[in-house]
Amino acid sequence: LSNTRGIGAARRWIKKEFEKISKDCGGCLEVKEQWTLVKGNPKSRIKKDTWIVNIYAIKRGTKYPNRYVIMIGDIDSRISDPLDGEGDSPGANDNATGMAGALELARVLSKYDFPTSILLAGLSGEEQGLYGGKFLAEKAKIEGWKIAGILNNDMIGNIEGVDGVIDNRTFRIFSEPYSILETEKQLKQKRFYGGENDGESRQLARHVFASTKTYLPEMNPLLIYRLDRFGRGGHHRPFNEVGFPGIRIMEAHENYNRQHQDIRTENGIDYGDVISGVNFEYCAKLTAVNAAALATLALAPAKPKNVKIGGIVQPSTILSWEKVD
């Protein structure tokens, strides 16, 4: 494998960067690789046996070491043909921006201790079928991780929409209303005692909105009440599908001339996901959005247990719950 080109070179470089950050903080980060073999299938985007490799770093929590808040970016990219594994596919915005954000937060947050563990990840195989997220979510489920939230950052660097709109303050937060694993009884309870905005992923999205308004008031977060864009997918979805709360954070205005395109110029229009299409100040702002959300979640206590609601025929609602450590 090349040390300068392709996803193998990218993941090795990312691992080295995590290791450098860990060295600077006295070994405070646990840097890990997750290798999973995907068998080739002529009907899928992976035609031959392929290793999917995730790279991640953990800043272990001082009080809740098995409780996690997670930020993820992707380390794979694609061009016009999703099966083209040879053509140049820089993926500067989709999704080097999300991965750069995860690396920067590893550097910044490693300087502090938190009660809850913080995990920063670079996941592979997103464009081929959300494989990296699927494998890390399965690992978390099998090992019994307690996950407070997954922040999937997928494209956080573009401010110029294909419609010509330029906006360096607005971003979108996608979230599903409730877990697909909820039972009929749980859904009935939600109908009578809550609503779709009380689902865990929706609550997580609202927390990101609130922390943004507190610490970055100049930013304009948009709560989008859907799992993702119409017909599209992201690496938060595999976590949702096994019951973990997860959301997608991304730019507000997409530019399809720069997304999933061969690098070329046609009729005076430049195509391709190259670095000139990334606004670094905007990327830094959305990285700060993640910093605020991760830090506040990691400093918070565990969620309360045995929550009960009362107050029928009374002027005020009465809430009760078990004391949190």
Residue ranges and their predicted role:
Residues 1-60:
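A non-catalytic alpha/beta surface segment that caps or lines the substrate-entry region
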Residues 31-33, 54-58, 68-73, 91, ...:
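Structural recognition of the beta-strand scaffold that forms the well-ordered cores
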Residues 123-237, 242, 246:
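Metal-dependent peptidase/peptidase-like ectodomains
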Residues 1-8, 40-46, 83-95, 108, ...:
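Second-shell loop/turn segments in exported
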Residues 156-174, 223-299:
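Active-site-adjacent mobile loop/cap segments within catalytic or ligand-binding domains
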Residues 57, 71, 76-77, 81-130, ...:
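Alpha-helical metal-binding/catalytic segments enriched in His/Glu/Asp
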Residues 300-310:
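Proline-enriched interdomain boundary motifs that mark the N-terminal boundary
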Residues 315-325:
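Conserved aromatic anchor
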